Amino acid sequence: MNERALKVLEFYKIKEKLKGFVKTNAAKDIVDNLKPYTNLYEVEMHLEETMEALDLLQTKGEPPFEGVYDIRDILIRVEKAMVLLPGQLLKVASILKSSRRFKDYVGRKHEETPHKNIEDICEGIELLKGLEESIFNIVISDDEIADRASLKLYGIRRSLRDKNDSLRDRVNSLVRKYSPYLQESIYTIRGDRYVLPVRAEHKGSVPGLVHDQSSSGATLFIEPMSLVNLNNEIKELLLKEREEIERILEELSLKVYNNLDVVNVNAKVIWELDFIFAKAKFASHNNCTLPKVSEDGIVDIIEGKHPLIDTEKVVPTDIYLGKDFTSLIITGPNTGGKTVTLKTLGLIHIMGLSGLLIPAKENSTIAFFEEIFADIGDEQSIEQSLSTFSSHMVNIVDIISKADHKSLVLFDELGAGTDPTEGAALAISILENLRRRKCKIVATTHYSELKGYALKTEDVENASVEFDVETLRPTYRLLIGIPGKSNAFEISKRLGLGEDIIEEAKNNIESDSLKFEALIEKLQSKSIKASDDARRAEMYKLEADRLKDKYEDKLKIVEETREKLLKGAQEEAKKLIKEAKEEADEILKNIRELEKMGYSSTARQKLEEERKKLNSKIHKLEEKEENLNKEKGKKIKEINLGEEVYLPKLDQKVIILSKPDNRGEVQVQAGIMKINVKLDDLRLVDKPKEENKKGRKREAKLRMRTVESEIDLRGMDSMEAVYNTDKYLDEAYVAGLKEVTVIHGKGTGILRKSINDMLKRHPQVKNYRLGEYGEGGTGVTVVELK
């Protein structure tokens, strides 16, 4: 598709709107590269995938895109075997989690509507739950690793806690001892070492190492000698901790490297799905529908709207082309809205051919064009010193050299910018050249000569945009088959031009021209009514077809459900018979055992009675199973037209409308539908007896399950996190847990604030606090339950 048409028809503005619905920069790059596809198969496939995504949005809600990131830079680091940072690993895990959840989201039960294209895309997803869980279990936040990431790290941190506790006790003792010499009775930390704020004049009173001083020089930060060894031990442990963390990160990065191809494919699938669902959301937001795509150049756009015009102001218009004519000449005044019609037609086609649903009514048809050419607007080059006419002609020459039978050509004010007589003649010649090549052409003009050309030329049709002379505004409604009327006299009169001047002007025009204008006016009013009636009739027909299809689908579902129920009842009966026979065999076995053991004849008699009861039960069940295979009621022997009979297949009464044909079928009225059925399938209406329906009691079972002592919210948005936490706290309370941990990560703090706001109001929460060192710090909240 040539870039000039995409620019002139403002497809880039559509893409900017589409970007507003994507989640990742990777998907935005896909949007940037979006353009019409080069073959019909691709167009239809991408339209179908958009429609499938729209259906999933409507039936299953928002897809699981929480925590989807653009990790292309991270994957480049992995490809170079570089060690990833904790935050980068979390983004990789989030992509894996999203791809896994998306596979569940798209997965369907047998009776659900298939979404073939999206399901095929999701086939590319390979689950790496082990790697995903490894990362989430080890990495708590962008800058924190879990204590239990390894036994060694756990031991180091436990030693750190013990050393820090000892050091704090020791330093508190020193604070009390040296308090007369301190600026404040506190301790502080400088360079990971505990120090005391000693007044400068007493530095000799506190033996130790000076690490820093205040900006005024009045305070020295001294590490007492008695703390040096403990501080050194802590420093040593911190270095070991850092080394172990680096080892753990290297190990995780290696796992990502070993699965790089799978991670890469999963990420690309998620980004593609992000793009597809953005198309669906765009369609929903703009009331777009799925068009049919014609390979024969047939266009039938029903109530098409320009997608860039305000929805409250845009006027829908019908545009059709390619069946009865291949060229459409839209005439009328310059302010008549002709250019909007051109742009609407062109932009709707570019959208549809790019896999986007179109802003038009259902059952609209677009044509598959390999090229769309547009000469719209005044785009002359100042540098080239081109006039308006020359600028247009340069573009027209290019179009003529490239256009063929698979092209749509749009001309705005063809032949304008030069002498009217020469311009009109040139316009007709250009149109003829392209028409002979079987191009589909829509051209606007205000030259009257082109009206005559359209009237006398095969495959060319006149059209105009309706104009309201009362308001002096175009209605933007396209009237195909009616040439445009200038309305110059009516407009001038409305604006206050004298009646005498208007009459004199009319006298200067040939009477034939005036009659022609009057004829056009009459044709316009008749055409509008005929067009409205035809379109309304078409809509009624489509609605009737839709209802018919819907009824037939329901009929099919009823029949399938009935067969399933019948089969289920038969299976249940067989199962009961089998159980009863097994019970009888057990009784016989017991009888033989009793005989061997010398039991009394009374005991034997009782067992025989039980056996007879079971035999009776088996006989009844077998009869019931046999009856299930028979249709209800008696067969019909005589046919009486208009008689009400019973049709078991539909489980409803029907009326006989005809005698049996040579296939043994009769026509019956079932509700609003007339259908043919086998005479043998009908039963007398008085025979089917409705049994009293007994409600089944439902057994309520209390389901208890193990509740974890922590919940991981990373990768969720605030709303989802609050909902899941609220539900989790209720389950934890019922399970008897007294203390739980909510992992929200550090990040920007928005998620933590949302959780804290919810905890303040939760009825099961007694108290809560941020995690301490080793628990996860500010990346977790510890909750005490009532």
UniProtKB/Swiss-Prot annotation:
EC class: hydrolase
Lineage of source species: Bacteria, Bacillati, Bacillota, Clostridia, Eubacteriales
Family the UniProt entry places it in: Belongs to the DNA mismatch repair MutS family. MutS2 subfamily.
Protein name listed in UniProt: Endonuclease MutS2
Keywords of the record: ATP-binding, DNA-binding, Endonuclease, Hydrolase, Nuclease, Nucleotide-binding, RNA-binding, rRNA-binding
Binding site for ATP: 332-339
Gene Ontology MF: a single term: ATP-dependent DNA damage sensor activity
Annotated Smr domain residues: 711-786
